[in-house]
From Swiss-Prot:
This is Cell division topological specificity factor. Belongs to the MinE family. It comes from Pseudomonas syringae pv. syringae (strain B728a). GO terms for biological process: cell division; regulation of division septum assembly. Prevents the cell division inhibition by proteins MinC and MinD at internal division sites while permitting inhibition at polar sites. This ensures cell division at the proper site by restricting the formation of a division septum at the midpoint of the long axis of the cell. Keywords: Cell cycle, Cell division.
């Protein structure tokens, strides 16, 4: 046994497999950090435009939220309507 063998990694793996494993961890972490989809602001803008055809509202009176529970996604839309 060489003294340098003691400091070497005991687990022999190819650099490609190590890189793949690290990339999978990074991708999983990024997916977990992404709480809102990219299309949500555009969807909110279009919904406000459609609602304005029927009711006089401001943009800040509409809140859009997307919630995911397992394989089900829930789009929640809250609109503060003006008094009549």
């Amino acid at each position: 046994m060489n003294i340098f063998d003691f400091f070497r990694d005991r687990k022999k793996g190819s650099t490609a497999s190590v890189a793949k494993e690290r990339l999978q961890i990074i991708v999983a972490h990024e997916r977990g950090q992404r709480s809102t989809p990219d299309y949500l602001p555009a969807l909110q803008k279009e919904l406000v435009e459609v609602i304005r055809k029927y009711v006089n509202i401001e943009s800040d009176q509409v809140q859009v939220a997307l919630e995911s529970q397992g394989s089900c996604s829930i789009l929640e839309l809250n609109i503060t309507l003006p008094d009549r």
